[in-house]
Amino acid sequence: HLIDVWDATEITAIDPDPYYDYQVARPRVRLTEDGKRVIDWPTTRIFLADPPGAPNSILLVQGIEPNLKWKNFVSELLDIFDDYEVSLIISCGALLADAPHTRPVPVTTVAATPELTENLDLEPSAYEGPTGIIGVVQDEATERDIASISLWAAIPHYVSSPPNPKATLAVISKLEDLLDISIPLNDLIDESRAWQEGVDQLSAEDDEIKDYVTKLESSVDASDLPEASGEAIARAVSYTHLRAHET
C-alpha cells in the first residue's frame, strides 16, 4: 500500500541466490501484457519514497523471510540502510490471535531496546526463545545504533489468509502516529468493509464459527481487548515467520 500511495521508486534488490531455498520459496511465472513469460524470483526489494509532510525520505522494504544465511542477509540489508543514513527502522507484520474479526484490530508496538521502550512508554518484553528475521534485524540495528520498532496487528486465526485490509488499515493508523504524517488510504476503507462483510457471511453460514466468534466478542468486550504482549508476538513470529505483507 505504501509503495503505491507514496509512488515509491525501486532503488535496489538483494540477490536472492545466497538466501533462498527455491524448493521452499519457489519462483513464480507470469505473463506480461504482450504474452511473454517472466520469472519472478523471491527476493527483498528496497524502494525510496518522499511522503508529503515527512521531514525525510523513507526507505520501504518488501520481501519474504530468507531461508539461509540470515546473518549475511541482515548485514547486506543494513549496509543499504547505512548508505542512506537510516536512523529508525519500523517493521510491520501480523500475528495470529484469539481476536474476533468484528472488533477493531489491536496493534502492538515493540521497541528493540529498554531505552526506546521507556521513551515511547511501551510494554517491555521479557520473551526468550525462537525468533524470526525481524528479531535478527533489530539486534543488528541495535549494534549499529539504529533505533528499531516493530508493529504487530493481531488478526483472527480462523481467517488468517492474506490480504487483510482491516489489519493494514490499523497498522497504517499506528504509522501515522509514529511518523506524525497523514497517509492516503485510497480504497483501503472500502476494502476493509468488504473484507469484514465477506467474513461475516462466511461465519453466518457455519454455526461452529459463528458461536466461536460470539464467544470471542464477549471475551474481548469484557476485557477491552488488551494489546498482545511482546512474548505473544515473538511466539507468533516464531510460528508464522515473517510474512510478506509489508506495507
Regions found by a protein language model. Give the residues of each.
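N-terminal short beta-loop-beta anion/metal-coordinating cradle
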Residues: 1-63
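Flexible, glycine/charged-enriched surface loops at secondary-structure junctions
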Residues: 10-14, 181-192, 209
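Short, basic, glycine/proline-bearing loop/turn elements
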Residues: 56-67, 119-123
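Internal, conserved structured core segments that host functional sites
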Residues: 64-114, 137
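Catalytic cores of processing enzymes, dominated by hydrolases/peptidases
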Residues: 98-182
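Acidic, Ser/Thr-rich low-complexity intrinsically disordered segments
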Residues: 194-238
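Conserved small/polar residues in nucleotide/adenosyl-binding loops
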Residues: 240-247
